[in-house]
Amino acid sequence: MLFIELLKAIFFGVIEGVTEWLPISSTGHLILVQEFIRLHQDKAFMEMFNIVIQLGAIIAVIVIYFERLNPFQPGKSPQQIRLTWQLWLKVAIACIPSIIIAVPLDDWFDAHFNHMLPIAIALIVYGIAFLWIEKRNQTLEPRVVKLSRMSYKTAFFIGCFQVLSIIPGTSRSGATILGAIILGASRTVAADFTFFLAIPTMFGYSGLKALKFFIDGNHLTLSQLLVLLVASLTAFAVSLYVIKLLTDYVKKHDFTVFGRYRIVLGSLLIVYSVFKSLF
């Protein structure tokens, strides 16, 4: 039984590692997959599991961009050190809206929107948004082509877009990429800032979910710990590849394909939801 659970954990880790960085909603995909492939765990653990396995994906960002994100990296010039600190300040400013709005409302949104139909609608709505933005951008040139040129004000408003991801199916990366592009950032800058903003956001969110799990009187069994570790390690390994793949992709392509994918998937989920309610 444990062996089968660990195989499922690997599968969930792959789903997380792929969908965390592509603007298609990792939480939405995990919930969808769990309709058909279920871990034999209680509800409290699964709610925590769906968030905490994202830590593996986040650690991949730190590994890939460690030199760029480390202000104490040997060999950096004074200007590079200053730019690194400025980047972290922009990330911190972008976190403010989530701290003020998303954290207090998280449980309420989970209770009311963490279901198939709201997820499907969010997938479609933001899919349409991506198609519209990319069509609009065909005649526009990005104003922000380097992260160092991004203003603190722009960083804050990207953080406001991130708050939208409190609705399951939205996609945190999708919301921030969409917001950054709307605010004039290039696709490369939008993707990079999304990666960096994920570090404090997801560490904080995962920490809160884990803390709530234990405060509510739950505890991890050995099998649950193994499932969580295996899924997180898998998400880490897959993310190393997907992050590099996405950064290369956005240099030559737009996000239209992801918009179309979201619309198709959302439509299929609505059909499935209706079919399930009837039968």
Swiss-Prot record:
Residue stretches spanning the membrane: 2-22, 44-64, 85-105, 113-133, 163-183, 188-208, 225-245, 255-275
Keywords: Antibiotic resistance, Cell membrane, Cell shape, Cell wall biogenesis/degradation, Hydrolase, Membrane, Peptidoglycan synthesis, Transmembrane, Transmembrane helix
GO molecular function: undecaprenyl-diphosphatase activity
GO biological process annotation, one example: response to antibiotic
Top enzyme class: hydrolase
E.C. code: 3.6.1.27
Keyword Ribonucleoprotein (UniProt): no
Keyword Lipoprotein among record annotations: no
Top-rank taxon, per record: Bacteria
Membrane topology: Multi-pass membrane protein
GO cellular component terms given for this protein: plasma membrane
Record-linked InterPro entries: UppP
Subcellular location: Cell membrane
Main subcellular location: membrane
Pfam families noted in UniProt: BacA (PF02673)
Catalysed conversion reaction: di-trans,octa-cis-undecaprenyl diphosphate + H2O = di-trans,octa-cis-undecaprenyl phosphate + phosphate + H(+)
Other notes: Bacitracin is thought to be involved in the inhibition of peptidoglycan synthesis by sequestering undecaprenyl diphosphate, thereby reducing the pool of lipid carrier available.
PANTHER family according to UniProt: UNDECAPRENYL-DIPHOSPHATASE
Family: Belongs to the UppP family.
Chain's role: Catalyzes the dephosphorylation of undecaprenyl diphosphate (UPP). Confers resistance to bacitracin.
Name recorded for this polypeptide: Undecaprenyl-diphosphatase
